[in-house]
Amino acid sequence: MRFFSVFDIVKNKANQLGYTETEMYAVLKNYNVNKKDLLAYKENGVIPTDKVLNGILSYLGMTKVELELKLGRIPAGLEDVFLNNTKEIAKILENKNSVKLNEFNSIQEIKPYFYTDLGKLYNGDCLELFKQVPDENVDTIFADPPFNLDKEYDEGVTDKNSFSGYLDWYYKWIDECIRVLKPGGSLFIYNIPKWNTYLSEYLNRKLNFRNWITVDMKFGLPIQNRLYPANYSLLYYVKGDKPKTFNVQRIPLQTCPHCGREIKDYGGYKNKMNPKGVTLSDVWSDIYPVRHSSSKNRKFNELSVKLLDRIITMSTNEGDVVLDPFGGSGTTFAVSEMLGRKWIGFELGNCEIIKERLKNKDKDKKLLGKVYEEKNKLFPNRVKELRKKNGLWIDDDFRQDHEGNSKGDKKNENNDQISLSLE
């Protein structure tokens, strides 16, 4: 396993010596390292300061250079040595390398738990199930992995892992995502910012960065001695120079719910505004968490239909393939079905919830219908009527001077032609 924290390296050494965690802390005291000192390096990749570092190095029986290499880093000040000795280093690595590429012809086919005309759902570990997917076979991947917060995601399915164990697992399935993506395919990773900082550093060496999207997390709980956590992060990367599909997404102008007046004053520019709405930015404040039981399909966390509709319509066209390695309640698959996308789904936990959801789509059709009441409109009908009532301008006042989209928008703004399976 790869190591990403000093704590995990120390713990691994203790395991090799047969120590319990309590015994490990007792032994470390002999090296002037107390429990509090070591725990400070449990959930990060920071290397300790001199006093603590010297004690840890003595316990591990290694130098600082060896410790940094153990963490997968080129030690500071030795970059030139590495660059000037790449051939020798490569020979050492190649002689040690015994990893074999997946040979799909020799892999036993796994039967899907459930399938429709558009997609297949598999029940099991995503790392095993990825082996069923050939190289460069998927147009878009959306992944909402466990956040490693010691939460229960399904009956008997929790996500507590060590710092290094979590990142090591994370990078393995990310590599599989990259393998199965088509050239120009899109990868979206939904997680808390802490983990996406590590992931973005890794992905920047493998894919083309497009956006770090901030998704407003409303009504979260405060954490002591920290800033109030108010967002999730959605990483958006592309395999290759540019996405093979990018459909412009537009949202309504922000208005007061009581009078309909716009929140921001656009002054003399209002007649130049696109009647299809405001171009979507990388801050999404209109995605509300699914918390009410009437909108949920299970008692655990669930993603918004609006979120998945936006991601899927932005990065795919009808008939394209969408993959989600952590199916959860099945929102990705339900939205893919309604948008006419093919899909591949993995889920380690209870797949029966997803199966029933896909067989009974009435609730999701209603939710998606509400999304499209506002999508690609400067003012939804209810807001437009409120503004007219209060004598405020509406886009119809300027439509004759604004012939639809601009030339640049027409090329990729085809969301009006999306065929929704809402009947």
Swiss-Prot record:
Keywords: DNA-binding, Methyltransferase, Restriction system, S-adenosyl-L-methionine, Transferase
Thermal dependence of function as given in the entry: The protein is very stable, after 18 months at -20 degrees Celsius it retains 90% of its activity.
Molecular function in Gene Ontology: DNA binding; N-methyltransferase activity; site-specific DNA-methyltransferase (adenine-specific) activity; site-specific DNA-methyltransferase (cytosine-N4-specific) activity
Chain segments annotated as coiled-coil in the UniProt record: none
GO terms under biological process: DNA restriction-modification system; methylation
Enzyme Commission no: 2.1.1.113
Alphabetical list of PROSITE patterns matching this protein: N6_MTASE (PS00092)
Domain of life: Bacteria
Ranges annotated as biased composition (Basic and acidic residues): 397-414
Reaction equations catalysed: a 2'-deoxycytidine in DNA + S-adenosyl-L-methionine = an N(4)-methyl-2'-deoxycytidine in DNA + S-adenosyl-L-homocysteine + H(+)
Region Disordered, annotated ranges: 397-423
Protein's recorded name: Type II methyltransferase M.BamHI
Annotated organism of origin: Bacillus amyloliquefaciens (Bacillus velezensis)
Gene (name only): bamHIM
